[in-house]
Every structure is written in C-alpha cells, then in structure tokens.
C-alpha cells in the first residue's frame, strides 16, 4: 500500500471536501429567517455527517476492494433484507416509508443499496463473460429489478430510477448487445409515456381520450397486456418453426409492448397521485401551483434573482422569507444560485465535473474488469443525481426527490456518496 499511496487522488478528495463545505454553508443559510435569526440547526448535524463521512471514505479506501468482491453477494443480500424490512417496520417521512430508525437515529437503506447493487452487478458481469449474452442480460436484469421493485414499494420513485442508467451503462461496458439495452430503454420509455399521457390529458388538455381510459383502467390494461402477450407467444412460435428473421423482430416489438404495459399497470398500483403529478408538473407548473409547481416557480425565481454575482451570502429573499420549500435538501442549489449567482453555480459545476473526470480516470487506469465496472457504476450515480437535481431546480426535469450529493442535507445520502468515493479511491490506490 505504501508504494502505491502516490496514487491517492488529491483532486478528487479536495473536490468532494469543497462541495461538502459549501453544502454546510448553505444548509446554515437555509436555517436563517428574514430577521437574520438562526431558526434551524440542521447544519450542525451536517457537519457531524461530513466528518464521519470522511472517516468512512478513508476506511473504505484503505480496505482492499478485491476482498469486498468476494463478499459482494452477501452485501447485496443484506441490502435486500433491509429493503424488505423497511416498508413494514420503517418510518414514514414525506409520504414514503424509506427509513429505519433506532430512537432519534435513522438511515435510508435504499441509499446504501445502490452501492451493494453496483458491487454485485460488477461481480456478476465480470464472472459471466463466458456465458451467452442473452443469459447475462436476463440475469443482470433480475439483479436490477429486485431492489427497484422493493424501493418502489416504499414508494420512492426517484431512488428507484437511478438503477436504470446504472444497469444500461454497466451492461454496455460489459459487452451486452445493444439490441438488448435498446429493449430496456424502449420498454422504460413507452411505459413511462403510458403513465404520463393520461395525466397530461387530465390536467392539461382537460380532454380524456379512449386510450387514456384504457391505460388508467386496470381491467382494460390487463386485457390489453393479455392480447400483447398472446401475439408475442404466437410470433415466438412462428420464429422457432419457420426461422424467419421477421418473426424475431415482431416478437421483439410485441415483447416491448408487453413490458411497457406491465410498467403502466405496476405504476398505477404503486405510485401515489402526488407522485404522478410531479412527473408532469415541470411541463406546466400551473397544474399544481400550490405544491410541486410552487417549488419549481420559486426555485426559478431564486436562480434568476441571483444574476451574475448573487445577492451575497445570507442575503437571499426566496430562502430567508421561506418562499422556497425543501431548501436544505432537494432545492439547495437554488439558494446557492441566488446568493452566489452564476459564478457560484459555475464553481459548483466545475467541482462536479472534476469529480466525474477523476472517477473516469480511475476507471481507465484500472487493470481488472471488476474494478473498472465498479468505478463506472459509481460515476453514473453521481452524474445522474447531478443532472436530475440541477434540471429539477431549473424547471426542465420532473421533481423526483433526487438530492444533490455532497450539498443536500441528509446523512444517508452523504455517507453513501462518501463510501462510493472511498471505493473509487481504493481501486485507484491499488493500480500499479
């Protein structure tokens, strides 16, 4: 280890540290009211979480990731057990039962499950390189769907959505055929479109079509799924009997429709009305002007008010007059943009870009396939959180409850982010 300690990534660590300090500053700012009085002490907890998170980062970095590889199945299984426990015995926070607690202490298992999932998926994709691509794709899909389903039961749509890009990117790097990945993408796209289309007609156009009635009626949806499934089975039989290529593509196409219908049916059962509304409110904030639409409008006002240089630290109006809800968590970038302006936003952007580049460099330097896949999975987590959260506060992405890692208030998200960075740094340390 000593001879490889020269591989310690100071730029990555300093970028993480800088973002964490900025996060504490603006969590403090969010707790100050219009009279300049500190009314919330969340920043003190965040300082403790940052300090303990840094300790976790170094402990994980110093532990040999190759040893973790052998226990990845156990780590994944423990994560699933915690996810199973949470919906029945967990705490309900903001409509989702995603916390388990002991007294005043609580953690969010779904945040740590992302790490367990990446470790196990990387382990499987590394060990299965001699298997057929279809078998690898199906098994990797099952590994992904199980935690996604358990997280949706909480229900926590934002965290569940993170698994899709991780799965697609890691499978692509592992050499899974593009047509299989295109299948997943199209199923997700059509499934989500099938969920949103009726909501769009109901809240925006005020005209409900026959298609929307079918998609929102469970009986009709199940009937339509049965029709698609029967047609898929017939085309599949035709392919095996006649070995014609067009039967293969017809089977592929109708299988996509079957998958999309399953997402629509499951979405109607699992997602609550306020979550469905959040998925379309960014297109027209007036749909839900007093809830999700209010958040988006106030966030954009705060960002616009900051201008180039901002209103100065602790001088923002949207935050200190409490116009902006969820200030220290989902919308912390709005406070930062108001008080530090465009320049402050660019500083944060630069720090995140540095993190992305350093993780990518660690992946490229890695000599073993398992470590490379783990680094890539971690990079996807950070990029997805960054893009969705920034898009959300700017009104160009749906409100999904995705925190801005290292900045947003919260111990579980911060600790999981620190552990993820620790894993990447540990992989980088052990390269020759």
Residues of each region from the PLM?
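Helix-boundary and loop/linker segments of multi-pass membrane transporters
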Residues: 4-6, 136-137, 321-324, 366-367
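Short pre-catalytic strand/loop immediately N-terminal to key active-site residues, enriched for Gly-Thr
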Residues: 103, 320, 405
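TM-adjacent membrane-interface loops and short helices in multi-pass inner/ER membrane proteins
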Residues: 281-332, 340-344
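A juxtamembrane structural motif centered on a specific transmembrane helix
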Residues: 1, 388-432
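Hydrophobic alpha-helical transmembrane segments of multi-pass inner membrane proteins, especially
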Residues: 13-29, 33-291, 334-394, 419, ...
């Amino acid at each position: 280890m000593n001879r490889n300690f020269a591989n310690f990534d100071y730029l990555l660590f300093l970028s993480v540290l800088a973002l964490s300090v900025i996060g504490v500053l603006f969590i403090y700012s969010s707790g100050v009211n219009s009279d300049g009085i500190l009314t919330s002490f969340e920043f003190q907890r965040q300082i403790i979480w940052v300090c303990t998170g840094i300790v976790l980062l170094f402990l994980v970095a110093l532990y040999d990731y190759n040893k973790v590889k052998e226990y990845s199945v156990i780590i994944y299984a423990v994560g699933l057990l915690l996810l199973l426990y949470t919906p029945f015995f967990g705490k309900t926070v903001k409509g989702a039962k995603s916390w388990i607690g002991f007294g005043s202490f609580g953690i969010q298992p779904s945040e740590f499950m992302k790490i367990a999932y990446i470790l196990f998926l990387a382990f499987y994709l590394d060990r299965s390189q001699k298997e057929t691509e279809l078998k690898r794709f199906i098994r990797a899909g099952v590994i992904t769907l199980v935690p996604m389903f358990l997280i949706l039961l909480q229900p926590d749509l934002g965290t569940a959505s993170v698994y899709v890009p991780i799965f697609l990117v890691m499978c692509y790097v592992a050499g899974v055929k593009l047509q299989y990945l295109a299948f997943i993408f199209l199923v997700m796209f059509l499934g989500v479109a099938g969920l949103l289309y009726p909501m769009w007609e109901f809240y925006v156009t005020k005209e409900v079509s026959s298609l929307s009635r079918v998609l929102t009626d469970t009986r009709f949806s199940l009937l339509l799924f049965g029709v698609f499934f029967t047609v898929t089975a017939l085309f599949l039989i035709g392919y095996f009997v006649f070995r014609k290529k067009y039967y293969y593509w017809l089977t592929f196409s109708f299988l996509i429709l079957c998958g999309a219908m399953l997402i629509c049916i499951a979405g109607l059962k699992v997602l609550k009305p306020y979550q469905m509304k959040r998925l379309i409110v960014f297109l027209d904030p007036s749909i839900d002007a007093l809830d999700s639409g209010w958040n988006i409008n106030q966030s954009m006002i705060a960002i616009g008010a900051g201008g180039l240089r901002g209103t100065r630290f602790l001088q923002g109006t949207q935050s200190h007059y409490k116009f902006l809800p969820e200030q220290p968590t989902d919308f912390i970038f709005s406070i930062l943009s108001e008080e530090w302006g465009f320049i402050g936003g660019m500083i944060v952007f630069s720090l995140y870009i540095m993190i992305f580049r350093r993780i990518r460099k660690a992946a490229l330097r890695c000599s073993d396939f398992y470590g490379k896949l783990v680094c890539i999975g971690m990079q996807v987590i950070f990029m997805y959180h960054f893009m969705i959260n920034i898009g959300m506060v700017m009104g160009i992405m749906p409100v999904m409850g995705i925190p801005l890692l290292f900045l947003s208030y919260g111990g579980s998200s911060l600790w999981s982010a620190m552990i993820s960075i620790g894993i990447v740094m540990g992989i980088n340390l052990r390269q020759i």
